[in-house]
């Protein structure tokens, strides 16, 4: 999926489960969701954060390759993104991502 296509979907403000399902079906979606959280100035980043959080609850192992980037979001200037990561990262630990903290 292309970034602009995903942005269009996120602007629809569907339930986060809808966007998590996109990530389950197409693994190119997950890094795009993270990129949107890292770079997007508009409110669409919140939909991306909710989708990543849902993935961390249901299939956290899918996020392990992106652990460094997710930890980096703890330094976001946006408090909602920071708080979202505080809810997301424990799922990675449960999925065996304990080594992401040592990097």
Model-predicted regions and their roles:
Residues 3, 24-37, 60-73, 95-103:
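Amphipathic alpha-helical scaffolding segments comprising HEAT/armadillo-like alpha-solenoid repeats
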Residues 10-11, 53, 90-91:
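Structural signature of alpha-helical solenoid repeat scaffolds
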Residues 40-42, 77-79:
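Short inter-helical turns and helix N-cap capping residues of alpha-solenoid HEAT/ARM repeat scaffolds
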Residues 1-11:
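Charged, compositionally biased N-terminal leader segments and the immediate start
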Residues 18, 48-51, 85:
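Conserved hydrophobic register position within alpha-solenoid helical repeats
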Residues 78-99:
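Ordered, amphipathic secondary-structure segments that act as subunit-interaction surfaces
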């Amino acid at each position: 999926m292309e970034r602009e296509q995903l942005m269009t979907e996120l602007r629809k403000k569907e339930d986060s489960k809808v966007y998590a399902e996109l990530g389950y079906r197409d693994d190119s979606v997950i890094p795009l969701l993270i990129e949107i959280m890292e770079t997007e100035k508009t409110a669409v980043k919140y939909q991306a954060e909710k989708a990543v959080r849902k993935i961390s609850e249901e299939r956290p192992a899918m996020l392990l390759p992106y652990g460094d980037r997710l930890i980096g979001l703890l330094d976001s200037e946006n408090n909602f993104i920071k708080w979202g990561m505080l809810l997301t990262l424990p799922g990675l630990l449960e999925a065996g991502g304990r080594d992401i903290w040592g990097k």
